[in-house]
A protein has these predicted regions:
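Domain-level signal for Mg2+-assisted phosphodiester chemistry and nucleotide/NA-binding surfaces
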Residues: 1-100, 121-124, 129-131
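Short, charged, surface-exposed secondary-structure boundary motifs
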Residues: 84-86, 140-145
Length: 147
């Protein structure tokens, strides 16, 4: 159930909610980011847009144009060891820093990774709405207030 504080806006209304959008590049494709941002815009203003991943890899070349066009700040996270997810840790640390800044009405977590369930629960405990968007290639993302 979506919180009554954060509901989709009509085109005639000004979005009032300030949202932090955090994207897990390890579990998203560049091709679906624009439809996801359009969906997020229905719920408020994405005042922070960050994406986390290792952008030095050849596989990440498709991100550059999308990030520039949509004013998304890349947060570089090297893979220091195999099997460890440094990207997840970096995203979670930033989310907690943003939470304690008290500048946001909600968070949008763009990932298909269930590792962020604990983060979503913690953000909700602070009274914030959490929108979980799964970045599938056919983008049938569900906007939810429970991650």
């Amino acid at each position: 159930m979506i919180s009554p504080r954060l509901v989709a806006k009509n085109d005639s209304e000004e979005p009032a909610s300030r949202l932090a959008v955090l994207i897990d590049a390890d579990n998203a494709q560049a091709a679906v980011i624009e439809p996801i941002l359009a969906e997020i815009a229905r719920y408020g203003e994405a005042t922070v847009r960050r994406i986390y991943g290792d952008f030095t890899s050849v596989a990440s070349a498709s991100w550059k144009r999308v990030l520039q066009k949509n004013a998304i700040k890349p947060i570089q996270q090297f893979a220091y060891t195999t099997g460890k997810n440094a990207t997840d840790s970096s995203l979670i640390i930033d989310a907690m820093d943003l939470l304690y800044s008290r500048k946001f009405d909600g968070f949008c977590l763009v990932t298909s990774d269930s590792d962020f369930t604990g983060l979503a629960m913690r953000l909700r405990e602070e009274g914030l709405t959490v929108l979980g968007l799964k970045p599938l290639m056919r983008f049938v993302a569900r906007v939810i207030d429970s991650y």
